[in-house]
């Protein structure tokens, strides 16, 4: 039996060891709990969050349910589909191979993937990383074919789609436009350079050394995922499952946990994998041929929040919403992984950061607060004032459309859940995303909408007059329109004062007239083009796919 002296010595040793060991992450913080209170229920999906401060995980907790069917709660070890947060790992893998001299970031991508067409302009590996390749986004292309958004996409199907393309959105390096196509190509590049799939390479080169034992790229949509949090979207007053089913990875595909992502966040400070040189490289901003730099680095975006520089990337697909938010000066990071389509992981991460960083952040500006709108930061406009801004707004450069409508007591983006909350008579904050919208008078007397993104990037739209359509004008657009690049035919028919697109067995798509010979649809903006007064083709602008043409089949 130990003596009193031996017991005292043992206590001293235990205390000393406890002081030297890393502190365990807290699982209680009332202020953080309040941020996630809407999800902290047994009948709701929710989120897992981890907080890293100066190399230590200081908070980790789950809110809501990983499985509503089986009553499984979310924990920091629940596995979530990371969506586009995956991109930083793909880019890091490519950077590792470049560091080892196995490829150059300035290699022509066709050196490794000859299936990419020769567009007459060199697309480099670096172009893929920074979204400056001009390659059309494959999600938009698949949507035009009628491929279901949750349907499986194999590497073979993806490469066949890419190989059919005859044009780019723009010359490589001349612009920045987000393209998931580029990051799937990067995953294929990793396989062809290293001889290992991205899943295998990341396991041995990244996840293993960092102890991220619950992370992997899921390149088989039928494979089981241990401790997976299923994803959900709202369906009236209840929830429905909304889980991706892709086999291609690189743009997404990563399953990970809040605990594992905390280990990844620490690597940006301690450089365990890659060393100092690679840590600096992956933060390098892209540069356009004009010499201008862009905020996008290696799957990471430079920005600022309340006066502090941040590096972040979010993700959204199916019902998953994810975010890694880092404050490099403070060596501070927040990871938010959600399985509810209603969650705004970016806003949640910012709110958590504000709890811990406190007065190290600048005061919230009333007009551009990144937090959710509050009574103190909004103004009330009459329905008449709101109606002045309703209408369709067109950006000819990007071929994108914004349709603004009055909804209840505010404005909204038509056919979306996004509300425009007024913070002044002319400026509005968009709910669920970090955008602001300002209305002004154009030089020609028209109304102009200026949209500002989270990194200060701006886009200008001009209000366009409503079209005058009748049965005769709509009938003039009817016919078959063919795309060899997609191997698909659209049949356009008038129906109920609109046009519809028929594509075989998939559901019809309605085209709603917006302005002269231009229609909006879930597939994008469709414009009919005339030559000598006759409609010869239609052109689709779908955000990340611009100027995509279908030729009108001749009528015999």
Q: What is the predicted role of each segment?
A:
Residues 1-11:
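Bacterial N-terminal signal peptides that target proteins for export
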Residues 10-19:
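Bacterial N-terminal signal peptides
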Residues 21-25:
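Sec/Tat signal peptide C-region and signal peptidase I cleavage site
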Residues 27-82, 102-107, 111, 160-167, ...:
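Short, conserved catalytic-motif segment at the N-terminal edge
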Residues 33-36, 49, 55, 79-106, ...:
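Active-site SXXK
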Residues 58, 312, 323-340, 447-452, ...:
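Short, well-ordered beta-strand elements
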Residues 67-68, 120-328:
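Short, surface-exposed loop or secondary-structure junction motifs
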Residues 350-556:
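Peripheral terminal and inter-domain segments
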């Amino acid at each position: 039996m130990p003596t009193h002296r031996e017991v005292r010595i043992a206590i001293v040793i235990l205390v000393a060891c406890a002081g030297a060991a890393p502190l365990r992450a807290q699982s209680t913080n009332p202020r953080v709990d309040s941020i996630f209170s809407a999800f902290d229920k047994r009948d709701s999906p929710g989120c897992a969050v981890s907080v890293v401060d100066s190399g230590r995980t200081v908070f980790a907790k789950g809110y809501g349910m990983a499985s509503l069917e089986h009553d499984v709660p979310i924990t920091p070890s629940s596995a979530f589909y990371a969506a586009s947060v995956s991109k930083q790992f793909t880019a890091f893998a490519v950077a590792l191979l470049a560091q080892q001299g196995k490829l150059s970031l300035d290699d022509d991508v066709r050196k490794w993937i000859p299936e990419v067409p020769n567009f007459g302009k060199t697309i480099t590996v670096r172009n893929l990383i920074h979204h400056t390749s001009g390659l059309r986004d494959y999600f938009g292309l698949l949507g035009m074919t009628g491929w279901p958004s949750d349907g499986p996409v194999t590497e073979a199907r993806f490469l066949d789609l890419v190989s059919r393309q005859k044009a780019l959105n723009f010359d490589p390096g001349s612009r920045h436009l987000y393209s998931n196509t580029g990051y799937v190509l990067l995953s294929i590049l990793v396989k062809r350079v290293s001889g290992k799939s991205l899943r295998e390479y990341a396991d041995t080169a990244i996840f293993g050394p960092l102890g991220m034992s619950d992370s992997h790229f899921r390149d088989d949509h039928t494979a089981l995922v241990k401790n997976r949090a299923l994803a959900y979207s709202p369906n009236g007053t209840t929830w429905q499952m909304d889980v991706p089913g892709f086999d291609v990875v690189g743009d997404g595909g990563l399953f990970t946990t809040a605990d594992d992502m905390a280990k990844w966040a620490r690597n940006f400070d301690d450089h365990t994998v890659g060393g100092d040189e690679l840590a600096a490289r992956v933060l390098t901003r892209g540069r356009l041929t004009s010499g201008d730099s862009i905020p996008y680095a290696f799957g990471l975006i430079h920005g600022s929040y309340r006066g502090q520089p941040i590096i972040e990337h979010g993700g959204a697909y199916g019902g998953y919403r994810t975010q890694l938010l880092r404050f490099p000066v403070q060596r501070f990071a927040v990871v938010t992984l959600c399985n509810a389509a209603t969650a705004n992981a970016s806003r949640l991460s910012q709110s958590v950061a504000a709890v811990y960083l406190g007065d190290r952040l600048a005061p919230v500006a009333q007009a551009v607060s990144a937090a959710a709108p509050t009574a103190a930061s909004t103004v009330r406009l009459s329905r008449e004032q709101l109606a002045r801004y309703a209408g369709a707004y067109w950006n000819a450069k990007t071929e994108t459309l914004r349709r603004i409508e009055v909804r209840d007591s505010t404005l909204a983006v038509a056919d979306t859940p996004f509300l425009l909350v007024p913070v002044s008579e002319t400026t509005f904050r968009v709910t669920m995303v970090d955008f602001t919208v300002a209305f002004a008078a154009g030089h020609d007397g028209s109304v102009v909408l200026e949209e500002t993104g989270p990194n200060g990037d701006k886009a200008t739209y001009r209000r366009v007059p409503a079209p005058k359509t009748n049965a005769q004008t709509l009938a003039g657009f009817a016919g078959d329109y063919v795309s060899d690049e997609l191997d698909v035919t659209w049949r356009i028919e008038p129906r109920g004062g609109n046009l519809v697109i028929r594509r075989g067995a998939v559901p019809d798509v309605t085209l709603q007239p917006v302005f002269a010979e231009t229609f909006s649809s879930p597939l994008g903006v469709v414009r009919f083009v005339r030559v000598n007064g006759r409609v010869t083709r239609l052109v689709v602008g779908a955000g990340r796919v611009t100027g995509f043409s279908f030729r009108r089949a001749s009528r015999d």
